[in-house]
Amino acid sequence: MSAGQLRRHEIGKVTALTNPLSGHGAAVKAAHGAIARLKHRGVDVVEIVGGDAHDARHLLAAAVAKGTDAVMVTGGDGVVSNALQVLAGTDIPLGIIPAGTGNDHAREFGLPTKNPKAAADIVVDGWTETIDLGRIQDDNGIEKWFGTVAATGFDSLVNDRANRMRWPHGRMRYYIAMLAELSRLRPLPFRLVLDGTEEIVADLTLADFGNTRSYGGGLLICPNADHSDGLLDITMAQSDSRTKLLRLFPTIFKGAHVELDEVSTTRAKTVHVECPGINVYADGDFACPLPAEISAVPAALQVLRPRHG
C-alpha cells in the first residue's frame, strides 16, 4: 500500500487510551463521548488510562499484543506521540480524538477538533492513510518517534525554560518563557549533515525538522511539508536581532516566513544535527540532547482519517 492513499479497515475492537490531563481535563469528557459513540455503533472497547506516559505506553503495548483492530487516543499531541512509540512500524491504525491545546496531528489529517463523536465516527468508518513518521536517535542509540515537528534552537530553549517554570500555567507560561529567551538571544553554532553528504555549518537561531507542517497549535513552521514523501522539511532561521525575530513570529501562522531573507529551507531523508547545549523537542515533548540523528521513515504508520477532505 503506497503512502498517501486511503484504504478501509473493518473496525470491530478498539483499544482506547486517554490522557486525563490533556486540555485541562477536557480529554476525560471527550473520551466518554467518543467511547459511547463507538459502543453505540457496535464496537468493542478496551479502555486504558495510564498513571503516567511510561505506564500508559506499557499498558498500550500489552493491549496491542493481545489483538486490536485500532488504537484510539484522546488528548493532545503528547498522547498521540506516546501511542506512536508503540504503533510505529505496525499495521494497527491510529485514531485520534482531539482534546489538547495544540492538536497539530488532528489538524494535519482534517479531524474535527471540537466534536468527539464525529471524530469517533471517523475511527469506526475505518479509512486509513499510510504516512511517514520522524525518528530521532540520540548518541546512545535510543530512538523516539514523532509525527509532526522536531524542534531545536530558540524554540527548544523556550521549552526548556517553560518546563522549569512553576507558574503561570497554560500558554501564558510559554509566552513568558519566550520573552525571557528573547532577552538572551544569541547565535547558536549548528552543524547539520544532510543524507551523509551535504554539510551545513552556520550560526542559526533555530533549525526545525517537519514530517508535517505545523507545531505549537497551528504554527506553520514547515508549510510545504508532505507527510507521505519520505522526506523531512527543514526550516532554518538566522537572526541575531530581536526585532527581526519578533517580526518573524507572526508570519509563521501563515507559513510566510519561508519567504524572508533570514529563513532558508531544504529537504532530506536523514539529518545529523549538532549544537552544544541544545535539546531536541518533538511533538512538543523533550526528546534528547544534541547531537542526534533525525530521519524520515516512509510508510511507518496507518492513521484513521476522513475519507474525503
Swiss-Prot record:
Enzyme class: transferase
Binding site for Mg(2+): 226, 229, 231
UniProt cross-references to Gene3D superfamilies, sorted A to Z: 2.60.200.40, Probable inorganic polyphosphate/atp-NAD kinase, domain 1
Major location (coarse): secreted
Any one Gene Ontology cellular component term annotated for this protein: plasma membrane
Gene Ontology molecular function terms on file: ATP binding; ATP-dependent diacylglycerol kinase activity; metal ion binding
An individual GO BP term: phospholipid biosynthetic process
InterPro entries hit by this protein: ATP-NAD_kinase_N, Diacylglycerol/lipid_kinase, Diacylglycerol_kinase_cat_dom, Lipid_Phosphate_FormReg, NAD/diacylglycerol_kinase_sf, YegS/DAGK_C
Classification via SMART domains: DAGKc
List of catalytic residues: 285
Subcellular location: Secreted, Cell wall
Cofactor mode of binding and number, as noted: Binds 1 Mg(2+) ion per subunit. This ion appears to have a structural role and is required for catalytic activity.
Alphabetically ordered keywords of this record: ATP-binding, Cell wall, Kinase, Lipid biosynthesis, Lipid metabolism, Magnesium, Metal-binding, Nucleotide-binding, Phospholipid biosynthesis, Phospholipid metabolism, Secreted, Transferase
EC number assigned by the record: 2.7.1.107
Cofactor (UniProt): Mg(2+)
Disruption phenotype: Cells lacking this gene exhibit a disruption of the production of certain higher-order phosphatidylinositol mannosides (PIMs) species.
Residues annotated as domain DAGKc: 9-140
Described purpose of this protein according to its UniProt entry: Catalyzes the phosphorylation of diacylglycerol (DAG) into phosphatidic acid. Is involved in the biosynthesis of phosphatidylinositol mannosides (PIMs), probably via a role in the biosynthesis of phosphatidylinositol (PI), a PIM precursor, which is derived from phosphatidic acid. Is also able to phosphorylate other various amphipathic lipids of host and bacterial origin in vitro, such as ceramide.
Family, similarity comment: Belongs to the diacylglycerol/lipid kinase family.
Name of the molecule in the record: Diacylglycerol kinase
Lineage, opening ranks: Bacteria, Bacillati, Actinomycetota, Actinomycetes, Mycobacteriales
